[in-house]
Swiss-Prot record:
Note: The VP6 trimer contains a zinc ion located at the center of the molecule. The zinc ion is not essential for either trimerization or transcription activity of the DLP. Zinc-depleted VP6 has an increased sensitivity to proteases.
One cellular component (GO) term of this entry: viral intermediate capsid
Quaternary data: Homotrimer. Interacts with the inner capsid protein VP2. Interacts with the outer capsid glycoprotein VP7. Interacts with the outer capsid protein VP5*.
Species, as recorded: Rotavirus A (isolate RVA/Human/India/116E/1986/G9P8[11]) (RV-A)
Protein name: Intermediate capsid protein VP6
Region feature Interaction with the inner capsid protein VP2, mapped onto this chain: 62-73
Positions of Ca(2+) binding: 266, 286
Function recorded in the entry: Intermediate capsid protein that self assembles to form an icosahedral capsid with a T=13 symmetry, which consists of 230 trimers of VP6, with channels at each of its five-fold vertices. This capsid constitutes the middle concentric layer of the viral mature particle. The innermost VP2 capsid and the intermediate VP6 capsid remain intact following cell entry to protect the dsRNA from degradation and to prevent unfavorable antiviral responses in the host cell during all the replication cycle of the virus.
PTM notes: The N-terminus is blocked.
Major localization class: virion
């Protein structure tokens, strides 16, 4: 993997900097590095493809070295270099595609394609010019079963979940009380509602709670907490739990009371915030517990009082909500990130070449299913294919 990264970094620099008119002295170190790459690769044969619709291609390396010049690089020099650069880039692209198409239930973090396994050989170690990539560093640590640390912005840590629970229900569905939520990606939105606006609740207060367990622990997370859940702020028709009928949800938004968010790790509370909104920090957690209250307003204008009558029918439904959004966090496991294209790149390659469903990844790389059942085997394979995708993205946009 380190060799693949070094080849890609060298080729990217060569493509960007070996251009007509450049002073040789400005790129002499790069050209020496480029020549070292050629010397190491010459005389070797590789094969890629042969899975799904990915065609088999054979690669042979027999290239001349780039020479020295006293002045600027001329058109002939650059054209000669370009021929070599384009062949190498095509090779790296195909190695990456081949690697992203394969998976293994055992030691999935190790190279799976024939070409990348060959590049891992001792003869290619001299190509290791630059291993500064975060993904390469973490791949090395994971390969040695040591602790990794990926920094994510908008991590896709929450599997998609949209549902409701009813604490008070009846066949007519005209006086309900409960909680509904939408968890997805890096965001939780939860709303508590009471058609009667807590008129019969103790002290006219209804208590709500929403608990979310993460598939992997996060550390040093920057989080935004808001006293609102905009996705539950408009009327909707909802299917009943048994699917036999539908019921109306017509919210009128109130501000939640006594809001508390707890971040827990292995059942132990690590951080607690009460009535604090905006930016908050969570040190280390694998579970989030949100609790909040709906309080019937003790004083109401006639217009508000008309919204929340003392008895049925309840045409408007008192609702309070919260939004919790993870803005950035560190995770020991690799995750999809809304700010990166790695999952999209891997999925697109596997779809384009009709890669058959293997023993590890779900059909279509379904992220909700993948993260819901995030096994060590999936983690290993995902770290490998994401590392390869990050390498490929240097050369192929």
């Amino acid at each position: 993997m380190e060799v693949l990264y070094s080849l890609s970094k060298t080729l990217k620099d060569a493509r960007d900097k070996i251009v007509e008119g450049t002073l040789y002295s400005n790129v002499s170190d790069l050209i020496q590095q480029f020549n070292q790459m050629i010397v190491t690769m010459n005389g070797n044969d590789f094969q890629t493809g042969g899975i799904g619709n990915l065609p088999i291609r054979n690669w042979t390396f027999d290239f001349g070295l780039l020479g020295t010049t006293l002045l600027n690089l001329d058109a002939n020099y650059v054209e000669n270099a370009r021929t070599t650069i384009e062949y190498f880039i095509d090779f790296i692209d195909n190695v990456c595609i081949d690697e992203m198409s394969r998976e293994s239930q055992r030691n999935g973090v190790a190279p799976q394609s024939e070409a990348l396994r060959k590049l891992a050989g001792i003869k290619f170690k001299r190509i290791n010019f630059n291993n500064s990539s975060e993904y390469i560093e973490n791949w090395n640590l994971q390969n040695r079963r040591q602790r990794t640390g990926f920094v994510f912005h908008k991590p896709n840590i929450f599997p998609y979940s949209a549902s409701f629970t009813l604490n008070r229900s009846q066949p007519m569905h005209d006086n309900l009380m409960g909680t509904m939520w939408l968890n997805a990606g890096s965001e939780i939105q939860v709303a508590g509602f009471d058609y009667s606006c807590a008129i019969n609740a103790p002290a006219n207060i209804q208590q709500f709670e929403h608990i979310v367990q993460l598939r992997r622990a996060l550390t040093t997370a920057t989080i935004t907490l808001l006293p609102d859940a905009e996705r539950f702020s408009f009327p909707r028709v909802i299917n009943s739990a048994d699917g036999a009928t539908t019921w109306l949800f017509n919210p009128v938004i109130l501000r939640p009371n006594n809001v508390e968010v707890e971040f827990l790790l292995n059942g132990q509370i690590i951080n607690t915030y009460q009535a604090r909104f905006g930016t908050i920090i969570a040190r280390n957690f694998d579970t989030i517990r949100l609790s909040f209250q709906l309080m019937r307003p003790p004083n109401m204008t006639p217009a508000v009082n008309a919204l929340f009558p003392q008895a049925q029918p309840f045409q408007h439904h008192a609702t309070v909500g919260l939004t919790l959004r993870i803005e950035s966090a560190v995770c020991e496991s690799v995750l999809a990130d809304a700010n990166e294209t790695l999952l999209a790149n891997v999925t697109a390659v596997r779809q384009e070449y009709a890669i058959p469903v293997g023993p590890v990844f779900p059909p279509g790389m379904n992220w909700t299913e993948l993260i819901t059942n995030y096994s060590p085997s999936r983690e290993d394979n995902l770290q490998r294919v994401f590392t390869v995708a990050s390498i490929r993205s240097m050369l192929i946009k």
